[in-house]
């Protein structure tokens, strides 16, 4: 498997380190010695899952609500172990205490939240070869196929549809662009932002962060949109900038300091961000990984709490991929 480093919140052993101590520097969680490649890491409130390129899923952390395993007596998965799935997996997302997968046959399954088995979510998808992807945050999930976005879960802020309601148990059509395919959905705790294949924001709903106005952003293109629970971040690779919207009570807004090297990757966790830059050193490149935001569990490095500015957490000769969880940070090499 790819070599995976993790740090941050670990009270339910969600970092896969074999202990339950929070860590403030990158720790090797997966040694990277069996050939499998990590495609994606998704995290809930206290559990983590990794999807590999062969369609397998492994997980660790909290199982008190059936997030990972069917054994109700198993309250905690101490180390990475396989998650039994109905079929090979092509995508995965996590809510606070739930796990949702899309299998190779285009079916959507959910477990957790008190359910200890995968049960099928009947999303009205077309039986064609269009990509199907799932995204989740806190108490919401959405599934994307072509021009359509379907969602279920909390609707207390009208993030799925109007009028507001406590929860939608069955998937509903959230949005249909009608023409251009949806690329992805960026989700916060009470809101979502839908982005098309041109990097344009086509829809936003729910309790949007302070300062974000949909009409002001819809004319822009080639954006990468990322969300924390309470903020929105727009990465413009051409301008080498990250623009943030929200209150920033714990330094979640991107620090407006000059970057001397190009940004090559950005990810967000619950209330922190992870940034990768490419640095030229002679004839070779090296890559720096920084964090910013709320680092209460060491997920932004040794300087815990709300630290202004970018915190350097690692330097690598190969380009890393980065993922953010609930006060956890992941680096994949």
From Swiss-Prot:
Give compartment(s): Cytoplasm
Q: What is the effect of changing residue 296 to A?
A: Does not affect interaction with KTI11
Q: Which Gene3D superfamilies match?
A: Regulator of chromosome condensation 1/beta-lactamase-inhibitor protein II
Which GO molecular function terms does the record list? ubiquitin protein ligase activity
Q: Where are the RCC1 repeats?
A: 1-53, 55-104, 146-197, 286-333
Q: Does the keyword Electron transport apply?
A: no
Substituting residue 96 to A results in: Slightly reduced interaction with KTI11
- What keywords are assigned to this protein? Cytoplasm, Repeat, tRNA processing
GO terms for cellular component: cytoplasm
Q: Does the keyword Repeat apply?
A: yes
Q: Which GO terms describe its biological process?
A: protein histidyl modification to diphthamide; protein ubiquitination; tRNA wobble uridine modification; ubiquitin-dependent protein catabolic process
Question: Its quaternary structure?
Answer: Interacts with KTI11/DPH3; the interaction is direct.
Function per UniProt: Together with KTI11; associates with the elongator complex and is required for tRNA Wobble base modifications mediated by the elongator complex. Association with the elongator complex is mediated via interaction with KTI11. The elongator complex is required for multiple tRNA modifications, including mcm5U (5-methoxycarbonylmethyl uridine), mcm5s 2U (5-methoxycarbonylmethyl-2-thiouridine), and ncm5U (5-carbamoylmethyl uridine). Together with KTI11; also required for diphthamide biosynthesis; diphthamide is a post-translational modification of histidine which occurs in elongation factor 2.
State what protein this is by name: Protein KTI13
Organism source for this protein?
A: Saccharomyces cerevisiae (strain ATCC 204508 / S288c)
Which gene is transcribed and translated to give this protein? ATS1
């Amino acid at each position: 498997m790819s070599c995976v480093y993790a740090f941050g919140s670990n009270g339910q052993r969600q970092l896969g380190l074999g202990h339950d101590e929070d860590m403030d520097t990158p720790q090797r969680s997966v040694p990277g010695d069996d050939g499998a490649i990590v495609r994606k890491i998704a995290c809930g409130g206290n559990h983590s899952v990794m999807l590999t390129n062969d369609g397998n899923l492994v997980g660790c952390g909290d199982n008190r609500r059936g997030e990972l395993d069917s054994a109700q007596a198993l309250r905690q998965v101490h180390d990475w172990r396989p998650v039994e799935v109905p079929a090979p997996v092509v995508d995965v997302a996590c809510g606070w205490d739930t796990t949702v997968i899309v299998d190779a046959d285009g079916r959507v399954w959910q477990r957790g939240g008190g359910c200890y088995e995968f049960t099928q979510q009947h999303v009205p998808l077309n039986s064609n070869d269009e990509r199907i992807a799932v995204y989740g945050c806190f108490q919401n999930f959405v599934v994307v196929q072509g021009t359509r976005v379907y969602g279920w879960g909390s609707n207390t802020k009208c993030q799925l549809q109007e009028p507001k309601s406590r929860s939608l148990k069955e998937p509903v059509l959230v949005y249909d662009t009608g023409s251009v395919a949806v690329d992805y959905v960026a989700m916060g705790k009470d809101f979502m932002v839908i982005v098309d294949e041109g990097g344009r924001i086509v829809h936003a709903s729910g309790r949007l962060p302070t300062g974000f106005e949909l009409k002001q952003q819809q004319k822009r293109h080639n954006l990468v949109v990322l969300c924390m629970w309470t903020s929105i971040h727009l990465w413009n690779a051409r301008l080498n900038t990250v623009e943030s919207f929200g209150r920033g009570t714990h330094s979640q807004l991107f620090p407006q300091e000059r970057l001397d090297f190009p940004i090559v990757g950005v990810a967000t966790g619950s209330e922190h961000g992870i940034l990768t830059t490419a640095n030229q050193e002679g004839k070779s490149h090296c890559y720096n990984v920084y964090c910013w935001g709320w680092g209460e569990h060491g997920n932004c490095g040794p300087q815990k709490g709300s630290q202004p500015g970018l915190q350097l957490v690692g330097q690598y000769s190969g380009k890393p991929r980065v993922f953010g969880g609930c006060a956890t940070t992941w680096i994949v090499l």
